[in-house]
């Protein structure tokens, strides 16, 4: 099953850009989970429901890594849970290197891990700058 996740930091922000990107990828609206709250942690009800629903072979699509969250350590941990424990794949639309369906060999995994760590760091740094 293919799922999408959308997060905006506040009720005033518009989620349409993310919804359109997921629809263009082929995610049906009923499989899109959305939270309207900060990405500082993963205590988000719809995100939790989505992760609980993921099964081996499922696909989670997000527009960008900062939509997943803005805490470096927690982004890495959630990535591990989804890809290693749940055995689901992740696609980050604005970063093709973060497509776990591709390059599952050692080099591909290494590149994806490096890019993920860098982008997770940037997401947390941006959150700290916003405060």
Which functions belong to the PLM regions below?
Residues 1-3:
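Extreme N-terminal starter segment of soluble prokaryotic enzymes
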Residues 7-14, 35-47, 54, 63-77, ...:
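Acidic, metal-coordinating catalytic cores used for nucleic-acid/nucleotide bond scission
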Residues 8-9, 83-131:
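Phosphate/pyrophosphate-binding and catalytic-coupling "lid/hinge/switch" segments at subdomain interfaces
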Residues 21, 74-81, 114:
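Alpha-helical scaffold elements adjacent to nucleotide-binding pockets in ATP/GTP-utilizing enzyme cores
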Residues 22-37:
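Short beta-strand elements in bilobed, periplasmic/extracellular small-molecule ligand-binding domains
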Residues 66, 81-84:
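Conserved RecA-like helicase motor core of SF1/SF2 enzymes
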């Amino acid at each position: 099953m293919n799922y999408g996740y959308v997060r905006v930091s506040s009720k005033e922000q518009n989620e349409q850009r993310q919804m359109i990107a997921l629809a263009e990828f082929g995610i049906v609206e009923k499989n899109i989970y959305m939270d309207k709250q900060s990405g500082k942690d993963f205590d988000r009800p719809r995100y939790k429901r989505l992760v609980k629903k993921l099964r081996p072979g499922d696909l989670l699509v997000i527009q960008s890594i900062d939509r997943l969250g803005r805490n470096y350590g927690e982004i890495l941990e959630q990535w591990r849970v989804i890809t290693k424990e749940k055995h689901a794949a992740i696609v980050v639309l604005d970063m093709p290197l973060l497509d776990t369906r591709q390059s599952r060999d050692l080099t591909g995994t290494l590149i994806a891990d490096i890019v993920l760590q860098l982008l997770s760091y940037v997401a947390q740094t941006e959150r700290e700058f916003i405060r």
